[in-house]
Amino acid sequence: MAKTAADVLVESLIQWGVDTIFGIPGDGINGVMESLRTHQEQIRFIQVRHEESAALMACAWAKYTGKLGVCLATSGPGGIHLLNGLYDAKMDGASVLAITGMPFHDLTDTFTQQDVALDRLFMDVAVYSTRVMGPEHVENVAEIACRTAVAYHKVTHISFPTDIQDMKVSRKTASKRNVEGHTSLVHARSGQLPDESDLRRAAEILNTGNKIAILAGQGALHATAALLAVAEKLNAPIVKALLGKAAVPDDSPFTTGGIGLLGTKPSQDALETCDTLLMVGTSFPYIEFLPRTGKARAVQIDLDPIKIGLRYDVEVGLVGDSRRTLEALLPMLTNKQDRSFLDKAQKEMQVWQELLKKRFSNMDKPMKPQVIAHELGKRLRADTIVSCDSGTNTTWWARHIPAQRGQMFSCSGTLATMACGLPYTIAAQIAYPQRQCIAFVGDGGFTMLMGELATAVKYKLPIVIVIIKNDTLGQIKWEQMVFLGNPEFAVELQPIDFVKFAEACGATGIRIDDPKECGALLDRALAAAISGPVVIEAVVDPLEAPMPAKVTFDQATKFAESLLRGEPDRGKIVS
């Protein structure tokens, strides 16, 4: 029996190792849905409640597994809804393929129902976006879309007219140049190493440095051993960009933790005072936290040549896989005898840890968000995957939930979209059924895509969702005050009873509002997850500010201005 065009697409995905697709059915994509039904023993379809979630799940799938993430939506509004999640994938370098429906091929661009030229709409978010022109076209574009997404860690897109999906594929109607079997499914993984002369130039810079700091990002997640070996040889503290949180365990004596507004003071001091910087797999966007231009000699390792020199004036760019490049560089490095720079960073970390301890040990009510983050961090298994949403909760996640060896952590690092935490966690749990998967979210971000709790219940996922409930868009509130000097405005949220919401969806809900009971209730929640999703409503102090590691004079001035100009919580904040 002849295959349909949709069958060719689905079987191409299977051959590329795709076994999971996230999405929502619709009349514009039902031909592909029928093929997924007939192939469901080889590829599973995860039905979500909003297409944005499908794209975020595909992004998280790619991040956590290293495989191609795939999302699917119908024509028009379905495809449009994918965009936010796809931009998250684009900006964090995740390999994602989006498949969307279209109207009948001979009615496109005629103002018919759901007639949106998604192939053109997706041209910015996707490096390859195409429209299927006929059933014999599918095999070619599917191969290119999969290969491009995987090879370049980018987003690709195929838009599929609804009538062509059901058409039979026939070699008789193929063009003479579309020779059968001319495509290949072989994926040549990059084995790229920098030129040896560049490696030696990089080694010369690192060997002559006196105060060397390493900045590690997402591209170093698989290079932990090599990263630590280089740090030990150079006596260099390792500073971690947000997406590089798991690149080095936080109990390593070489790391000073994160950098930026969510980072640590020792990390900021290390970058401010270093004379040599080694950047590994990062395009950390907050340039103001890097060494002043001209202060440090720099070497950068990145798989993408476009990222070399993007954030800092590096002397040597090493294009290649971070682990293999570090391993090639290691024999060229000399053992540093002077430990003073590293020792200083380690002593500062001890002081920083004492400061954190003071904050997470505070038993006052309302409960401080640092308490729930710290107590959760103590209870995570060695195989835990923690996905964080965007907001003040990101600060507590970054500083108070330490990364242990074997754990995974991720968030929307560059787009910093709200609502990603729950979809990320669902994807992680589906990818790794035996691992503990936690969502650490704020009430603002959670409510944007809270319908996905029903998805977690439907698929009986043992996830735990920790909601930091402060009834406010906290990050925006403090940005208004500290960065602009304005009183808060339009940031209060209507309170929601998340325990009742969880129960209405068929999940377990647990409220924590007393810091003295926090640990025991967390134990109960984590144990209850064996039966399905658990929602923890952690009621916290809305006036606990996610302050930068080092407050600048301008920030302090702006904060004072906001109080003087009518900040409604001025009395409580001052007291």
Located regions from the model:
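Active-site diphosphate/adenylate-binding microenvironment
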Residues: L9-V10, I14, D27, V32-R37, ...
